[in-house]
Swiss-Prot record:
Zn(2+) binds at C59, C62, C81, C84. It is found in: Cytoplasmic vesicle, COPII-coated vesicle membrane; Endoplasmic reticulum membrane; Membrane. Component of the coat protein complex II (COPII), composed of at least five proteins: the Sec23/24 complex, the Sec13/31 complex and Sar1. Interacts with SEC24A. PANTHER family: PROTEIN TRANSPORT PROTEIN SEC23. It comes from Arabidopsis thaliana (Mouse-ear cress). The gene is SEC23E. This is Protein transport protein SEC23 E. Transmembrane segments: none annotated. InterPro entries: ADF-H/Gelsolin-like_dom_sf, Gelsolin-like_dom, Gelsolin-like_dom_sf, Sec23, Sec23/24_helical_dom, Sec23/24_helical_dom_sf, Sec23/24_trunk_dom, Sec23_24_beta_S. Residues 59-84 are annotated as: Zinc finger-like. One of its GO terms (cellular component) is COPII vesicle coat. The lineage of its organism: Eukaryota, Viridiplantae, Streptophyta, Embryophyta, Tracheophyta.
Length: 765
């Protein structure tokens, strides 16, 4: 259902904007409260996107690509760029174009096109870069956990394309680089884990320093690395047996651990070594470091906690009070790893499975800036890890569509400035006239590096309107244009360039706000506010997210609501805004704002996924969907409210990170008595089966795979549902509830009380 809505709303372009018409002055834009922003899924799949087997024509002044909005003079064979109005001549190979013979990029319906670019000359004729995976495995785990991780790795290696290059690093107290090309026996290069090592030291120790390294050349020769390097990176078809044998022999870290102490785990050194190895072998080629980590780093750079078990891992309170002694130093270290990986064009994927925290909060900068995947689970044996890890390497419809080595560039009409981006990207520091002075997220640029991206990757770009008073935007042309140019390497190694050009209207909101109101996208606005709040919580000391959200909601309702002064009962909201207060109510209660129920690792995990998923997925994170199943009616959406609970109903809650199947009291009793096994109760068996099938469909289509919880009313796991419901019935008004329903033991305000307070504050003189 959500996916259908998403397809309809994003269309061929994969772009959703908070406002689909823009006020033509900076002052009027600031009164809109919700920022001018666009959420783009740069490589989202769509059946109608044409693939053109040539390179695009670019404007010689602003570098925008030729598009359907350009004015074309077919007689003079020239086109006028809609961004800078530069007149550009068509090259000779376009001489046959006419009104009836258009190239693909000029068809009005093709506002998004994809170009197939020739491979770089350095790679040799017609050859493409194979994908590269360096697996980094933590061995400081109990035997059972290590076996789960090794089993997952073996399965992954079997699923890789035959030409994919594979490397392997294991670590515990020390980091071990395995020379897979030395098949006669197991050959390992050992790095001490207790101190930081430079990139040059890593290369010298591996025998890749100086003359043995290909200085600065891009990509592998003939599709594979040179002879000095294929010691460590081999095609999957050649090293599968060696690697499987190595994994069979691999044991838990043998270094002794004192009683009452944690294992000595050198995560930082292991990731440094993996990054250095890839930087020497394959700079500028699509490659991923896939790290499987089972506990906190306690040794060397990136340490997050001491070895003494009596010292707890940092909490949100510790971070707020600046009482986490290792935190800032670890973040600084991972920031340096992030910069190195971004320069090389490589990705860090993190699979963290442990009951304790492992340092996701510190590693967030390296994972997010490189566009890496992140999965957090309790065990390597848990379905959340096992199924998610398998999905990364699968082909077919379930494939994530992992792509490499991308860049996103934005061209925009004059008078529009780019403030920055939130999401899995890193600024390329490309300055220009379209770059704003104020910065949000990854700013000071009009281009970003996307080392890793997939079919659901979504970035939020923030815009501002030029403050120059002499020239009002929209005076000469009532339309403005934004162009998103995304180049990337697909899983087959081809380089593609996707060009999306969107056109929107300028309006004078000071004269009439009706068009502005009709162009408001409530879902996108809620997601953008959530991402902005999350960024501010991380970067601004003492930031109160709840108060900030409340103030902005009050300002928005004051601006766009209809009411009489000091008369709360008169307040009404236009249907284009009517769902927004509900989104903010649920956002205030969500794990993104109420962080003290979670560890810093969990909060970092939730925020990374919030920042990278498409709008429909992010909306479910903020406001879960609830479906009800009963004998009386087919499955239908239900209010996210405790009043939806009934003894004779089954509820299916999709909260994105978890999916809950909740059986009412009567349903649970009948199931326990085995009625569904009796032929005369076929309808009951079908009722039990329907939410199970729907929940499995959600689990199959989502990445990371959500936690599936099956529970009964009044059972211990019912809390997974109750925590997400509007507490319209609490212990304070339980006597008003109908039989078979439920109450929530909380002092939180309900949506109704929240809305009443909002009305009072909005209408105040």
């Amino acid at each position: 259902m959500a996916e259908t809505a998403n397809t309809d709303l994003e269309g061929i372009d994969g772009v959703r904007m908070t406002w689909n018409v823009w006020p033509h002055s900076k002052a009027e834009a600031s009164k809109c409260v919700i920022p001018l922003a666009a959420c783009i899924s740069p490589i989202r799949r769509h059946a109608d996107i044409p693939t053109l087997p040539y390179a695009p024509l670019r404007c010689r002044t602003c570098s925008a690509a030729l598009n359907a909005y350009a004015q074309v003079d077919f007689t003079a064979k020239l086109w006028i760029c809609p961004f800078c109005y530069q007149r550009n001549h068509f090259p000779p190979h376009y001489h046959v174009i006419s009104e009836t013979n258009l190239p693909g990029e000029l068809y009005p319906q093709y506002t998004t096109v994809e170009y197939t670019l020739p491979p770089p000359v350095a790679n040799g004729e017609g050859l493409v870069d194979p994908p590269v995976f360096v697996f980094v495995l933590d061995t400081c785990m109990i035997e059972e956990e290590l076996d789960f991780a090794k089993s997952a790795l073996k399965q992954a290696i079997g699923l890789l394309p035959e030409n994919a290059l594979v490397g392997f690093v294991s670590f515990g107290t020390q980091a071990h680089v395995h020379e897979l090309g030395f098949s006669e026996m197991s050959k390992v290069f050992v790095f001490k884990g207790d101190k930081e090592i430079s990139k040059d030291q890593i290369l010298d120790q591996l025998g890749l320093g100086g003359s043995s390294r290909r200085g600065g050349s891009k990509g592998p020769q003939n599709g594979f690395p040179s002879s000095g390097l294929n010691r460590f990176l081999l095609p999957a078809s050649e090293c599968e047996f060696t690697l499987n044998s190595l994994l069979d022999e691999l044991q838990s870290d043998q270094w002794p651990v004192k009683p009452g102490h944690r294992s000595q785990r050198c995560t930082g050194v292991a990731l440094s070594v993996a990054a250095g190895l890839l930087g020497a072998c394959l700079p500028g080629t699509g490659a991923r470091i896939v790290a499987l980590i089972g506990g906190p780093c306690t040794e060397g750079p990136g340490t997050i906690v001491s070895k003494d078990l009596s010292d707890p891992v940092r909490s949100h309170k510790d971070l707020d009070k600046d009482a986490a002694p290792y935190y800032k130093k670890a973040v600084k270290f991972y920031d340096s790893i992030a910069k190195q990986l971004v320069t090389q064009g490589h990705v860090l994927d993190l699979f963290a499975s442990a009951l304790d925290q492992v340092g996701v909060a510190e590693m967030k900068v390296a994972v997010e800036r490189t566009g890496g995947l992140v999965v957090l689970s309790e065990s390597f044996g848990h379905s959340v890890f096992k199924d998610s890890f398998k999905r990364v390497f699968e082909d077919g419809d379930q494939a994530l569509g992992l792509c490499f080595n991308g860049t996103l560039e934005i061209c925009c009409s004059q008078d529009i400035k780019i403030q920055g981006a939130i999401g899995p990207c890193s600024s390329l520091e490309k300055k220009g006239a379209s770059v704003a002075d104020t910065v949000i997220g990854e700013g000071n640029t009009s281009a970003w590096r996307l080392c890793g991206l997939d079919k659901t990757t979504c970035l939020t770009i923030f815009f501002d309107i030029s403050s120059s008073g002499s020239n009002t935007p929209g005076a000469a042309n009532p339309q403005f244009y934004l162009q998103f140019l995304t180049s990337y390497q697909n899983p087959e190694g081809q380089t593609l360039l996707r060009v999306t050009t969107v056109c929107r209207q300028w309006i004078d909101s000071a004269v009439s706000s009706e068009e502005l109101v009709q162009g408001f996208d409530q879902e996108t606005a809620a997601v953008v506010m959530a991402r902005l709040a999350s960024l501010k919580m991380e970067s601004e000391e003492g930031f109160d997210a709840t108060r900030w959200l409340d103030r902005n909601l009050i300002r928005l309702c004051s601006k766009f609501g209809d009411y009489r002064k000091d008369d709360p009962a008169s307040f009404t909201l236009n249907p284009y805004f009517s769902l927004f207060p509900q989104f903010i109510f649920n956002l205030r209660r969500s794990q993104f704002v109420q962080v003290f129920n979670n560890s810093p690792d969990e909060t970092a995990y939730f925020c990374m996924l919030l920042n990278r998923e498409n709008i429909s997925n992010a909306t479910v994170m903020i406001q879960p969907s609830l479906t009800t199943y009963s004998f009386n009616s087919p499955a239908e959406p239900a209010l996210l409210d405790v009043a939806s609970i009934a003894a004779d109903r089954i509820l299916l809650l999709d909260a994105y990170f978890s999916v809950v199947v909740f059986h009412g009291m009567t349903i649970a009793q009948w199931r326990n008595m085995g009625y569904h096994h009796q032929p005369e109760h076929q309808a009951f068996a079908e009722l039990l089966q329907a939410p199970q099938e729907d929940s499995q469909m959600i689990v199959r289509e989502r990445f990371p795979v959500p936690r599936l919880v099956v529970c009964d009313q009044h059972g211990s796991q019912a809390r997974f549902l109750l925590a997400k419901l509007n507490p319209s019935a609490t212990y304070n008004n339980a006597n008003e509830m109908s039989t078979g329903s439920d109450v929530i033991f909380t002092d939180d305000v309900s949506l109704q009380v929240f809305f009443e307070h909002l009305q009072k504050l909005v209408v105040q003189s």
